A protein has these predicted regions:
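Residue-level detection of the helix-turn-helix DNA-binding "recognition helix"
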Residues: 12, 26, 37
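A short, Lys/Arg-rich alpha-helix, primarily the initiator
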Residues: 1-12
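Helix-turn-helix/homeodomain-like alpha-helical modules used for DNA recognition
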Residues: 61-80
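Short, charge-rich, low-complexity interaction segments located
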Residues: 36-47
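Residue-level "edge-of-site" marker
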Residues: 24, 45, 69
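DNA major-groove recognition helix of helix-turn-helix/homeodomain DNA-binding modules
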Residues: 46-63
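Short alpha-helical DNA-recognition segment
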Residues: 17-34
Length: 80
């Protein structure tokens, strides 16, 4: 799982808008925006949240720490 803070941080690191994330992950922009309005772990469809996480990882994002206690995000530039 990933937290709302991690989603926002990953988007910022990649310079993506919510619409760009939605397009790349194959979900609606309304879904991304709805998730980002929440706190902690989004109350979300697991399949959709997994698609978002996997798309970030394809672009060099690594999610670190516990998403609720010490959420972290690292961008690996190798291969991009």
């Amino acid at each position: 799982m990933i937290s709302v803070c991690q989603i926002k941080a990953a988007r910022a690191m990649l310079g993506w808008s919510a619409v760009q994330l939605a397009e790349r992950a194959g979900v609606s922009s309304a879904t991304v925006k709805k998730y980002e309005m929440q706190i902690g772990i989004p109350n979300a469809n697991t399949r959709i949240l997994s698609a978002i996480k996997l798309k970030f990882e394809e672009f060099g994002i690594e999610f670190t720490g516990d998403p609720l206690v010490n959420p972290g995000v690292t961008l690996h530039l190798n291969g991009l």
